[in-house]
A protein has these predicted regions:
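Active-site-proximal helix-loop elements at catalytic-domain edges
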Residues: 33-40, 102-106
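N-terminal glycine-rich phosphate-binding loop for ADP-containing cofactors
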Residues: 21-37, 70
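Amphipathic, non-transmembrane alpha-helical scaffold segments
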Residues: 15-18, 22, 94, 98
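Glycine-rich loops and low-complexity Gly/Arg-rich segments
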Residues: 2-3, 25-28, 96
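Membrane-targeting and insertion segments and their boundary/processing signals
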Residues: 3, 17, 21, 52-56
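Conserved Rossmann-fold dehydrogenase catalytic segment
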Residues: 1-18, 39-44
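NAD(P)-dependent Rossmann-like dehydrogenase/reductase catalytic/cofactor-binding core
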Residues: 44-113
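Short alpha-helical
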Residues: 8, 24, 77
Length: 113
């Protein structure tokens, strides 16, 4: 696609979101697993399976079909429990991205089961 000159910065920001920011999320998740006692290699293996499976599902089926988990189910009790055990940047990122996930869930043709 040809990107208009006045949209190139937005295009680059979108690319950073889909690429570089995912690295930050992965690192935050690995840090939380380390707090749970995971060795770095075990955290890497656990997260790699989740990340690769999710990336494949998104690429093949889109975000609406790929969304699972508490936001997809409208499970606020689980989200609240997650937020209560997180702190700092991890808590804020979780909260902000959960709002995005709720918007994705609202676009589904059929509710998640």
């Amino acid at each position: 696609a040809r990107i208009p000159a006045d949209q190139k910065t937005r295009y680059h920001a979108a690319a950073v979101m889909a690429s570089n920011l995912v690295v930050g999320l992965y690192d935050m998740a690995a840090s939380e697993l380390a707090t749970c006692g995971f060795a770095p290699a075990d955290a890497k293996a656990a997260l790699a399976a989740l990340f690769l499976g999710n990336a494949r599902h998104i690429a093949e089926d889109g975000v609406e079909a790929s969304l699972t988990g508490p936001a997809a189910r409208g499970d606020q009790a689980t989200i609240d429990a997650h937020l209560s055990c997180l702190s700092g940047d991890s808590r804020e990122v979780y909260r902000l991205l959960t709002e995005v996930l709720y918007r994705i869930a609202s676009r589904r043709a059929t509710p998640y089961r």
